[in-house]
Amino acid sequence: MKYGIVSIVGKPNVGKSTLLNNIFEREVVISSNKPQTTRNMIEISYDSIEDCVINFIDTPGLHNPKNKLDLFLNSQVKASLKKSDLVLFLFDLSRDFDSEDEECLKVLKDFNCNNVVLVLNKRDLKSEEEIKNAKQSISKMFDFTNVLEINSKSKEDVSVLLNTIKEHIKEYEGEKKDLELLKKEVSDKFFVSELIREIIINSFRQEIPYGVAILIDEMKYEQDKNLLTIVYSIIVEKESQKPIIIGKGGSMIKKINISLRERLSDIYDCKIFTNSYVKVKKDWRNNETQIKELGYKK
């Protein structure tokens, strides 16, 4: 039996969360075409390969920090590297290699990561010659354990990736019952809060999504009614953002709740009731106490 902790690392909006969802063939983490969607170091176990358990860590994209929340996000990436047995450095072939990619490799070097697989994603969008050139140029910058070219939407390519991971992690030497204790799951409450944030990210433009956090005030299931009740607060950092989130006549907050109920109906086989509030915590992204209160803890 093999076991390993595997971090997926790369610059913002490179497709780390999408890759993880494609591995699990369902949505286990939120994803968006906007950068900095992932805020937490999310660890979740995959055990669908024979004689192997992989604890994947989806990390925030490494980027130049603009506030204390950004510093926290970068610290999450570095914390994941400390505990990882293998790192996947994800590169999007449809984008140029830039300073953010360089910074990721620098961090990997600084942490003496010696078991790193370069994963070149979106190979379907490039010619063989272009892929070869990208592979050669990036491989000169770091001593990778292996290099893979994939299309993360391809089940065959994902299978190749999983088997490669299995090759590069160690045998588990403990008792099988102890291995069960090492498995990780995303809690329902955390997943719902992230789902709400994803809906908001995809519903608004510019800075508003990045100044939003979600607090689940109540989440309970009443078996006799087959009813799941979710009460939550949308936290914004400026008074001017509150009416934008609410919308004219409550139109936007209504849209958010309708989308949430529709998404949850695909997951939970029950009736769903949601109630939401919009609250202001001024400049919370620069307030360490509020950052912790909102669930972003090291």
UniProtKB/Swiss-Prot annotation:
Region (G3): 58-61
Region (G2): 36-40
Entry-linked Pfam families: KH_2, MMR_HSR1
Any one Gene Ontology cellular component term annotated for this protein: cytosol
CDD domains in alphabetical order: Era, KH-II_Era
Any GO molecular function: small ribosomal subunit rRNA binding
Residues covered by the KH type-2 domain: 204-282
Region (G1): 10-17
Protein name: GTPase Era
Organism from which the protein derives: Malacoplasma penetrans (strain HF-2) (Mycoplasma penetrans)
Lineage: Bacteria, Bacillati, Mycoplasmatota, Mycoplasmoidales, Mycoplasmoidaceae
Gene: era
